[in-house]
């Protein structure tokens, strides 16, 4: 995967020299996130590359292609290289370390953005669907872009996703060979819902340099929260960072 991403970066670099349609930014952020699993909180210093060349784009772990792009509507097909969750038994709390490792999946998806100009030109409705070898997700999001000042933007959002039976069972179910310690029963959940809300803000120091901050929260329905290996709580993801736009 690392070699593949480096290849993509090299291709985009060549494109940047050859064509003015190339756009790029790099974000370095520090964030903290509570885990859905019964384990330690996860900390990280992620680097988010963002590149676009005509209709082709790379955004974090997502590589996509826009095949419709109009003023009020655009759609894209994409591949997410890091969809899902990744957890090892060694990261779990005492009594729950017998679980097998859960791994990210590579998912292919479709996404569309509809500007709801009848309500506000800054309001966007986003339906999506993605599927990988470990299951599928269907989502619907609503976001609003508000320019507080010329150099300050704020964007609140809400979304709901349905995670398929296969997806939910792989990441949150419990098989017989995982029993041990505090895990005493198998668990085979049906599909579940994920409800989310977020707030993103960005302050531009210059045309190229900006600071950003974000907070995201999500809650799962009972199919996930009743799992022996998960926590019944609101999952939060809070962070801040700097972005450089080329």
Q: What is the role of each PLM region?
A:
Residues 24-32, 51, 62, 77-83, ...:
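Transmembrane beta-barrel strands of outer-membrane/channel proteins
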């Amino acid at each position: 995967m690392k070699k593949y991403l480096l290849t993509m970066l090299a291709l985009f670099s060549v494109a940047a020299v050859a064509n003015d349609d190339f756009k790029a930014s790099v974000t370095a952020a520090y964030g903290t996130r509570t885990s859905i699993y019964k384990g330690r909180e996860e900390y990280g210093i992620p680097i988010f590359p963002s590149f676009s060349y005509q209709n082709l784009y790379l955004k974090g772990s997502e590589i996509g292609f826009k095949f419709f792009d109009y003023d009020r509507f655009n759609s894209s097909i994409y591949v997410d290289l890091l969809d899902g969750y990744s957890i090892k038994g060694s990261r779990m709390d005492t009594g729950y370390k017998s679980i097998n490792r859960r791994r990210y999946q590579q998912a292919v998806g479709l996404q569309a953005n509809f500007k709801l100009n009848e309500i506000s030109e800054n309001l966007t409705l986003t339906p999506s669907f993605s599927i990988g070898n470990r299951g599928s997700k269907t989502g619907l999001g609503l976001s609003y872009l508000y320019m507080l000042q010329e150099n300050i933007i704020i964007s609140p959002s809400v979304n709901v996703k349905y995670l398929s039976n296969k997806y939910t069972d792989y990441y949150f179910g419990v098989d017989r060979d995982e029993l041990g310690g505090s895990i005493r029963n198998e668990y085979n959940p049906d599909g579940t819902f994920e409800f989310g809300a977020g707030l993103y803000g960005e302050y531009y120091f210059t045309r190229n340099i900006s600071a950003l901050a974000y907070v995201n929260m999500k809650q799962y329905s009972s199919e996930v929260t009743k799992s022996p290996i998960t926590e019944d709580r609101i999952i939060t993801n809070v962070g801040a960072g700097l972005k450089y736009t080329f």
